[in-house]
Amino acid sequence: MGSSTETLALIDEAVQRPRQRTGIPEDLPTPVDEVELDRWCAAYLASDATASQRTPPSVRIPNGPSADVAASWGGQSLVDSALIQIPVLIVRGEWDHVTTDEDARRLFNALRGASDKRDVKISGGNHWLHLQPRRVALWAEVRSFLGER
């Protein structure tokens, strides 16, 4: 499922489940076990009170962020990052297929006005790093960055 209206897309469990493996080398095990993924999928569907009214149950998500990502991948800058003057932490997993090294480098270099900027790539994770065993490293990086403020 992945049908959309002008402003919303409907995303079901069958679409979400395979995403947690995207970018992870084939010879490595899936870092999110089935029990954890089942729990996450249930919480994901519960996040939309209308999910159970559709078959299959699905979550309404705004299309805006997807359009913004597509525009960015197409070379269109959506903001003038040089105007950002606050501390910025860019953090991603080593196998993140959404935020690539090139994307992070481009943003890091564009943040010319940031009072502090840091680019961190965490080993052993992809774009779903927040659900994976290496999420502890993600939390540590965020805590460290925020603790310095």
Which positions does each model-derived feature cover?
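C-terminal alpha-helix
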Residues: E141-R149
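Conserved alpha/beta-hydrolase "acid-adjacent" motif
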Residues: H97-D103
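Catalytic His-Asp charge-relay segment
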Residues: Q85-R92, D96, L107, K117-V120
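Short, glycine/charged-enriched secondary-structure capping and boundary segments
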Residues: E6, A104-L107, R134-V136
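Alpha/beta-hydrolase
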Residues: G2-L89
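Catalytic histidine neighborhood in serine/cysteine hydrolases
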Residues: R112-W128
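Catalytic histidine-centered segment of alpha/beta-hydrolase-like enzymes
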Residues: G125-W139
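A short, conserved beta-strand element in the Rossmann-like catalytic core
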Residues: G2, V98, L129
